[in-house]
Amino acid sequence: MPITIDIPDGDDKVFNWAFARLRQIDNKFSTYKPDSEVSKYIKDEINEADLSKELKNIIRACRAAQKKTDGYFSAWAGGAFDPSGYVKGWAISEAGEIIEKQGYKTYCIGAGGDILAASDSDKVWNIGIQDPIDPKKLLNLNALAPHQNLSGAVGNRIAEPQVFGAGLSISNGAVATSGNYERGKHIINPKNKQPADELLSVTISGPDIIWADVLATAVFAMGRPGQEFMKSQPDYQLFMV
C-alpha cells in the first residue's frame, strides 16, 4: 500500500531510514511474500519456539488485543494467522520513532487509512477522511456527532483532534479508518466468521496509532454495538457511517 511521510525540512537521511524500517517490517511480516517469516510460520516451516523475538512479541500483542476487544479484533479471524491488522499501525509507530530519534518532532505518516501526526510547534495537521459512499469526496465529520469525547496524552503532549470543515485537525495523535468500500468485504467478524457489513466506515482518533487501528477494526466488526464498547475507551473518539 502507498505510504507517505511528511517531515518539514527533513533531510534525505531521515526519510531513507524511516522507509528502510518500513521495508524491513514488510519483508518480515507480509503474508503475500512467500519467504517472509510470517509466511513460513503460517506454512509450519518454522515452529513458534524458533521465531524471532520481534514476531513473538507481535503474536503476544495480537493475543492481548483480541482479549481487550472481546475477540472482535483477531489475527486469526480468517483461520490462519494474519497480523496485518496489527502490524500496519505498529509499522507506522516504528517509523515515527526513527524520525523522532533523528531529532524531528513535527511529521505526519500515512498508510492505508492510518495516520500518525506529531508537532512540537503551532503546526496542526488537517486530515480528511474518505467518504465511503462517494470515495471521490471527503466525509463531512460535522454531520456526524462524535460518539466519544477525546482527551489523551502522547508523552507529555496532549492529543486533541478537533473537527475542522470536513475532517480532523490534529497536533499530536493518530487517526485510523476501517471500511469495506475499497477492498471489498475483507473484515471478518470473528464471532460468526462472516464478513462484517453493517457499517460502511469506522474512524477512530486518539493518542496511539496501534490501538486506534485495532479499535477501528474491532468496532467495524462489532457494528453498531461498537458505540457501547467505545465507552470503555475514554481516550479515543469514534466516527462511524
Each predicted region: which residue ranges?
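Mature catalytic core of soluble alpha/beta enzymes
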Residues: 1-241
